[in-house]
Amino acid sequence: MKLSNTRIAVVLGLFALTFAALQFSQTVREKPIKQPLSGFPVTIGDWKFARKSFFSAPVIDMLGVADYISYDYIEGNGGWLNLYISYFTAVGVTGGYHSPQNCLPGGGWNIASVEDVPLARGGQIKKVIVQKGGEQQVVLYWFQNRGRIIASEYWEKIYLVLDAVFKQRRDGSFIRIIGQVPRGGDREKFIQEMLDFAGQTVDLAAQFIPGA
């Protein structure tokens, strides 16, 4: 795969920023979560909690998450969503994110489109459409870190280094929502419902995740 000059420049810039962080950041403070994610609301708008999933101890150790939830929500029209929130006290020190592309559904699902989309409350998040045969899923994700809502992996890394240097902080969270488009349903309407859910999630997560 051929890399564009822009992408090469970004990667080199990230290396330079990382080097600067290592040179000038003497200490990075681990930032505890405000309150356990287990208290995350079980009702968000029209969506009601259905069940929760858990990682095995080895997976938790591998990820280095300080806290996480994986909740399924359903609504009256048969819609289904999975909300995953992971929190790290010091990304790259106590644990860290995997590439969001690795967190997308596998098992024969193929990426159909990727784009940044705005939220009505402000800010942008990533929207990915994946498909398998006649089925489609919508994946929304973003980084909610130190008071910012970030869609781009590159900008997340840049802010991570800058905040390590100037604030001695590397705490952050990765949030992902997966929804199954109902067969025969209105995909655009369903996506809008997911975006509304995401906007509410941003505001609710701020009650748990440390801000700026």
What are these regions (language model features)?
Residues 45, 79, 171-173:
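A generic secondary-structure signal marking the coil-to-beta-strand transition
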Residues 39-40, 65, 167, 193:
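Generic detector of ordered secondary-structure context
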Residues 4-19, 23-26, 116-212:
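A short, solvent-exposed beta-edge/loop patch
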Residues 27-44:
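Alpha-helical transmembrane signal-anchor/signal-peptide segments
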Residues 48-51, 56-165:
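Short, solvent-exposed recognition patches
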